[in-house]
């Protein structure tokens, strides 16, 4: 019993020391909502992967979703540039240094993954994520907590 208890304690300690949250899962729906309002990004991870699943059924041209990450101070400036004429391939956004990360746009039933180099984020700054499909950002956005 003593050996079992020792091994149990060791495994718990090892899990808390070595565990890191380097993979985030988000779902978007046909109701123009993410299933989370905040995500936590761990800077101890060199890379973090965000997996976005579109849990709805509507096609990409009617209800596409993606994940865009910007500094909170730039949210208004970036969202004002969203335009259908820029196309789904670009997430309806022009190229901009203010866009730190952007995933591919997906339609109902599809999933996209965004690999992020965590060195591009600064713990002293505030970040947000949002969907850049025209009109979605007003409801589909959230805060990013960096630890």
Q: Model features per residue range: what roles?
A:
Residues 1-5:
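Positively charged n-region of N-terminal signal peptides that target proteins for export
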